[in-house]
């Protein structure tokens, strides 16, 4: 099964500006832009610095990260998100094997946009407080995306 994750924000926030900030976060983490495609959604593919070849190690899933930035269109993944006035700003596809990379990205993103929510297709929602708790664990938990965030409350 392939899971996807979405960063949700209030729909009144300027999407183009946030997309620019998101790219800066990825660059800070060592990703470089490789391809930008499509009109309504921007398909951003990033390759980890140091991976200067176009060939990928199929065992290193974190070396390629595929993120759709919704700058022109509106996607609301659930009724719960709609009732909270949230819509998709960024969608991570095929998140399996990239859980810790996504956690690091979310931690940096939510430092700037603390009202953002991370939604996973398995029905789980993560707030900034949830992400902070998981990010600050003594031992990284690569399975965090598949666990209820309440698991990490003390």
Q: What is each residue range found by the language model?
A:
Residues 1, 15, 42-47, 54-57, ...:
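Aromatic-enriched hydrophobic runs in primary sequence
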Residues 1-4, 8, 100-154:
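Acidic, proline/glycine-rich low-complexity IDRs
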Residues 1-44:
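Short, extreme N-terminal segment that most often corresponds to the first beta-strand
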Residues 17, 63-65, 85-87, 114, ...:
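Alpha-helical structural elements
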Residues 28-97:
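Short, intrinsically disordered low-complexity segments
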């Amino acid at each position: 099964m392939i899971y996807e994750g979405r960063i949700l924000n209030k729909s009144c926030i300027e999407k183009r500006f946030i997309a620019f900030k998101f790219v800066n976060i990825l660059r800070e983490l060592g990703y470089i832009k490789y391809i930008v495609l499509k009109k309504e959604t921007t398909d951003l593919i990033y390759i980890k610095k140091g991976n200067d070849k176009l060939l990928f190690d199929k065992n290193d899933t974190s070396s390629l990260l595929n993120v759709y930035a919704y700058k022109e269109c509106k996607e609301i993944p659930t009724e719960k998100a709609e009732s909270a006035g949230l819509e998709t700003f960024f969608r991570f596809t095929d998140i399996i094997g990239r859980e810790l990379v996504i956690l690091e990205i979310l931690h940096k993103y939510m430092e700037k946009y603390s009202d953002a929510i991370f939604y996973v297709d398995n029905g789980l929602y993560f707030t900034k407080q949830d992400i902070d708790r998981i990010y600050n664990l003594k031992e990284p938990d690569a399975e965090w995306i598949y666990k209820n965030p309440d698991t990490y409350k003390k």
